Amino acid sequence: MLSLLNPKAESIQRAQALQVNISAAIGLQDVLKSNLGPTGTTKMLVDGAGAIKLTKDGKVLLTEMQIQNPTASCIAKAATAQDDATGDGTTSVCLLVGELLKQAELYIREGLHPSLISDGFNLAKNEALTFLDSFKTDFEVDREVLLNVAKTSLSTKISSKVVESLAPAVVDAILTIRRPDEPIDLHMVEIMKMQNRSASDTQLIRGLLLDHGARHPDMPKQVKNAYILILNVSLEYEKSEINSGFFYSTSEQRERLVESERKFVDNKLRKIVELKKEVCERDPTANFVIINQKGIDPLSLDVLAKNGIMALRRAKRRNMERLQLACGGVAQNSVDDLNPEVLGWAGSVYERTLGEEKYTFVEDVKDPKSATILIHGPNTYTIQQIQDATRDGLRAVKNAVEDNCLIVGAGAFEVACAAHLRNKFAAKEVKGKAKMGVYAYADALLIIPKTLAANSSYDTQDAIVALQEEASEGYKVGLDLKTGMPFDPEVEGIYDNYRVIRHMLHSATVIASNLISVDQILRAGRSSLKEGPPQ
């Protein structure tokens, strides 16, 4: 029938279509499987231009790899959507989808209809979500617990030595910008990079770091007790917004024209200098700093330097809001109503030079609502890895604070949920052949602890049996990657995010259910409809 509708369309039907989907899902699973956990391996990505990227991050891999297979591409998009929504769980989604399809295939080969397995998957998912709510651990915001959350997330991406220095910076950044009863805005945490020193020198700045310095050699490079004027005012002569022209016939006329143009800017400078003198008369130890979003011409810089004012021009727009949150003060679009109340304050503002780059640090602020994480590293590969890990760590801590609950990690939830689904839910509450789908779902969940064991060079069967024996006695047990034996993850401070696990169960189940329900794959785009030349 399809050949009558479109002679050039390609079609794969029934068992063959299912096999194509299962093979694609398992293929993607095999690529990502070795990345999972702290002992996972790193992938090297080489693009068409020969640029190299080293990463363990599932989202980076799925985004950078050019996936041609439509089924694998579908899974990859869902997994990256998981990262966009929760900040983690990309690799876990791909592993779980692949394992769900692999387990489903075993029952389909025995003659069970895919729709019955799909029904079982949905029943198991709903029960797993209910079990997740009973399995979670409630907690009040505590720095030590949040440090463990950050370390759990970061250790899957970077080395343990770097984790020890980066985790406190990530947690303190979240606690700095957090406000009661308000959502946490991660845009208020700036991530800056410096290619120098070692990765373990990464630090948190409770303030702001600007990637440029003062533009005049006579300006002070370091000031204490700094009053900061945040401006969005042009301190240079600008062309008018409408087309206009001026004509002069003598040099005197030209001089008067230049003088009137200069007077326009000088009037603005006079008001700024008057404000500076007013502030310094009140507090003789005070210094004055201007951070302007627009330009400052050389003559204006000279005037400011003579008055001992440190001035930065063309600050990035995104930093203007962060600057107000970090230092206080109000950004001014005009110099007409300047007064000391609009000024921000910082205990220290200083400039540092690294190679040809200049950086300005704004530190020791009173009540920062914005912060900067400064990443150090010996090369671009290391810095990029730390940057990706930092973003994931910030999301993990943010999720924990907003959820007010955690899930013990190291595969503990998956082992406990699999036992619950198989021994209690399927055995007592599910009737008919849908029970097979629940069994398949329970077995598929074990892919997470199995992969953790395999990546740590332990026998997967020994590890799973030991975990199941401990879990059957009612304990929350995970896999100790150092010994390969069961242990209590809560004692070691290994936690996963509640919303990450919840989203993973939703996403993986929906994708797997849809893929096993496919009985025909059609390739019939516009290009296949083009007729050849007439004979």
From Swiss-Prot:
Q: Please name the Pfam families in this protein's record.
A: Cpn60_TCP1
Q: Where in the cell is it found?
A: Cytoplasm
Tagged with keyword Cytoplasm = yes
InterPro entries per UniProt: Chap_CCT_zeta, Chaperone_TCP-1, Chaperonin_TCP-1_CS, Cpn60/GroEL/TCP-1, GroEL-like_apical_dom_sf, GROEL-like_equatorial_sf, TCP-1-like_intermed_sf, TCP-1_chaperonin
- Record-stated family: Belongs to the TCP-1 chaperonin family.
Record function comment:
Molecular chaperone; assists the folding of proteins upon ATP hydrolysis. Known to play a role, in vitro, in the folding of actin and tubulin.
Question: Which NCBIfam families does the record cross-reference, listed alphabetically?
Answer: chap_CCT_zeta, thermosome_beta
* Name of the protein this chain belongs to: T-complex protein 1 subunit zeta
Q: Which gene encodes it?
A: cct6
